[in-house]
Amino acid sequence: VNKFTDAAGNNNSAATQFTWTYDNVNPTLASSSPADNATGVAVDANIVLTFSENVAKGSGNITLYKADSTLVQTIDVNSGLVTVSGTGVTINPTANLDSAQGYYLHIAATAFDDAVGNSYAGISNSSTLNFISVDTVNPTLLSTSPADNATGVAVGANIVFTFSEAVKAGSGDFKLYRSDNTLLEDLDVTSGAVTFSGATVTVNPAADLTSLTGYYMKVEATAVDDLTGNSYAGINDATSLNFTAADVAAPTLSSSSPADNATGVAVGANIALTFNENVAAGSGNITLKKSSDNSTVQAMAVGGGNISISGAVVTINPTANLDSSQGYYVQVDATAIDDTSGNSFAGINDTTTLNFTAADVVAPILSSTSPTD
């Protein structure tokens, strides 16, 4: 404007120029903490928004959602949970974030204004400001193989731990004890005996387990971590993971009646075999033979009436009595006698392991006299 003229046509005495500046630019979001797509955000962190210019509170809500769109909290911009200082806005949710949880933020379009009343456009989608909180939860043990209190565990079995999340080696040991508290193996988590795959840890002891022996495992509290570094609490007792190895030992013959090489055996005597553990009938025969010519006196099926089993004792009752002063031996098929776990007695297949001689029960007779009758 160069001049002003009044109603009578008079101009102002000097030419003056006036300039007006209009602010019609809305504030924009310059940055945020946490940043969009941030991970590992502290669960107690505030949310800080930094704008392109100084802002003040307007009206409306700031809304925090979980990644699945579950509403976490609606915060009135004029509440004490929102503070404004220059270009910065700090939002302090009432509760801490959940561990390892995804979130996103909505902001009403009228929530923040610049000094002349231009409003920030707001956020109304799930992608402009989203983030994931840090994992603060320790991994837990879901299952083991063998399970706690398991019996019949294969002597060559590995010990497998399955956790609630993917894990990695920390520092420390897995320890295998016998049930009498003898430490058998101390396995460092970084050794080749311990392998990690996802949520699974496999422990491979150097030596096989011993038949029918009890064991338990301990795990140091720093040995297993999740991928964020939270540690599994560990096992420090003898009961949380204990198990018993399978019976893989075949029964053995402890004694017999008659004993090997016995003489003067009663001709009507039964033959009793006593084993080192309880046994049961398998399949096959127990055979009585003469020593003189290896002829078979009787082959008796273990499931037949000539053989009875009680606990660790097998009693053989031949159909006929022994011959007076006759030598005999007993043979047992390798599948004939089993223990209660199905392990078979090795059997007897020779002429010397169990041989004996029957008593002389024949009265002498007069062959001749001198002088003759």
Model-derived features: positions:
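Short, surface-exposed alpha-helix to beta-strand junction/turn motifs within ectodomains of secreted
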Residues: V43-V82, T110-D113, V155-V194, T222-T228, ...
